[in-house]
């Protein structure tokens, strides 16, 4: 994997810097590195593809070295270099696609394609110029079963989940109380509602709670907490739990009271925040517990009082909500990230070449299913294909 990264880094630099008119002295170190790459690769044959509709291609390396010059690089020099660069880039692209198309239930972090396994041989270690990539560093650690640490912004840690629970219901569905939520990606939105606005609740207060368990622990997370859940702030018709009917939800938004968010790790509370909104920090957690209250306003103007009558029918439904959004965090496991294209790159290659469903990944690389059942085998394979996708993205946009 380190060799693949070094090849890509060298080729990217060569493509960007070996241009007509450039002083040779400005790129002499790069050209020496480029020539070392050619010397190492010459005389070797590789084969890629042969899975799904990814065609089999054979690769033979027999290229001349780039020479020295006292002055600027001329058109002939650059044209010779370009021919070599484009062949190498095409080779790297196909190695990456071949690797992204394969999976294994055992030791899925190791190279799976014939070409990448060959590049892992001792003879190619001379190409290992640079492994400063975060993905390469963590792939090395994972390969040795040591602790990794990926920094994610907008991590896709929450499987998609949208539902409701009713703490009070009846066949007519005209006096309900409960919670509804939407968890997806890096965001949780949860709302507590009471059609009667806590009319008969103790002290006119309804208590709500929402607990979310993560599939992998996060550390040093920067989080935004807001006293609102905008996705539940407009009227809607909702299917009943048994699917036999529908019920009407017409929210009137109140501010939540006694808001508390707890971050837990293995059942132990690590951080707690009470009535604090905006940016908060969570040190280490695998579970989030949100609790908040809906309080019937003790004093109301006539207009507000008309919204929350003392008896049915309740045409407006008192609602309070919270939004919790993970802005950035560190995770020991590789995740999809809304700010990165790695999952999209891997999925696109597998779809384009009709890669058959294997023993590890779900059909279509369905992220919700993948993260919901995030097994060690999936983690290993995802670590590998994301590392390869990060390498490919240097050369292929």
Curated annotation (Swiss-Prot):
Coiled coil: none annotated. Zn(2+) binds at residue 153. Keywords: Calcium, Capsid protein, Intermediate capsid protein, Metal-binding, Ubl conjugation, Virion, Zinc. The N-terminus is blocked. It is found in: Virion. The keyword tRNA-binding does not apply. GO terms for cellular component: viral envelope; viral intermediate capsid. Its main location: virion. The keyword Calcium applies. Ca(2+) binds at residues 266, 286. GO terms for biological process: fusion of virus membrane with host plasma membrane. GO terms for molecular function: host cell surface receptor binding; metal ion binding; structural molecule activity. It holds the Pfam family Rota_Capsid_VP6. Residues 62-73 are annotated as: Interaction with the inner capsid protein VP2. Homotrimer. Interacts with the inner capsid protein VP2. Interacts with the outer capsid glycoprotein VP7. Interacts with the outer capsid protein VP5*. Intermediate capsid protein that self assembles to form an icosahedral capsid with a T=13 symmetry, which consists of 230 trimers of VP6, with channels at each of its five-fold vertices. This capsid constitutes the middle concentric layer of the viral mature particle. The innermost VP2 capsid and the intermediate VP6 capsid remain intact following cell entry to protect the dsRNA from degradation and to prevent unfavorable antiviral responses in the host cell during all the replication cycle of the virus. Belongs to the rotavirus VP6 family. The VP6 trimer contains a zinc ion located at the center of the molecule. The zinc ion is not essential for either trimerization or transcription activity of the DLP. Zinc-depleted VP6 has an increased sensitivity to proteases. This is Intermediate capsid protein VP6. It comes from Rotavirus A (strain RVA/Human/United States/P/1974/G3P1A[8]). The lineage of its organism: Viruses, Riboviria, Orthornavirae, Duplornaviricota, Resentoviricetes.
